[in-house]
Amino acid sequence: MARILILTPQLPYPPQQGTSLRNFYIIRGLAERHEITLLSFLEEKQSVEPEAIAPLISLCQRIETVPVPPRNTAVRLRQLLLTRRPDMAHRLYSAAFNRKLHQLLAENQFDIVQIEGIELARAIEIVHAVSPHSKIVFDDHNAETELQRRNLLTDLRHPRRWVAAAYSAVQVARLRRFERWACAAADAVTCVSAADREQLAALLNRQSPVTVIPNCIDVDGYQALADLQDWTNLSRYDLVFMGKMDYRPNVDAVLWFADEVWPGIKAKRLAHSGLSTTWAIVGQKPHARLERLRGLDGVTVTGWVE
């Protein structure tokens, strides 16, 4: 049995979006054989009341939380101009979190410190300084450099997005350096897919192995529609897109589909069968760029759903 300290960017319960889903099920899997301590940021509406996070409490020997640090546009601009780090390296950098991490490392002998996501990668420096014997696992939830590069290419296609493209161009260079450093500084690197592994391997010039740990969910924990007794009040849609709708790749995907594909689907189906077509965009926190889709015939932007 190993003693593992896991660092997460938000409390991974309830697991309601990609990051928290991955982190919760990683914790659940590791807890079967190892002793888990969790240090997590706590978002504004998250609760640490025992009844609210009972499944997470059952998996962890100890849970510590720190509020997400406030960060406004002025702070982001200052960091952009006065440092060489990428925006993501500043997003969750917190003196309170660093103090709590330092305390946990000083008070305990952790075999492994597992860092979930690039926003927390600067913690590597603290682990090296305070607990040099601890092995560091860096779980790179996205191949962030490649993701930002694709954002840049997407924005370059639209003159109205050229300011965003300029920002992305700066971030690509900074992320390349930072992500390479984080991967090289860790004792082990994990990612979510073979495609991400190839991107990270290229970034590292294949000097360090990258292990794929796919995302997973417990399908038995979700009620199937077949179990519902009354279907009469359920809305039905021909097409459904599900995802966290303030996540940039999801926003870009939905807008592209709406502009390039959706009109053709509606027209062809109406011409061939006389049927109208409906499309639901399902997911929490819809970005402001999606507002224009609410006016499209047949399109529903739901926001959060149970």
Which residues make up each language-model segment?
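Conserved nucleotide-sugar donor-binding subdomain of glycosyltransferases
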Residues: 68-122, 126, 162-185
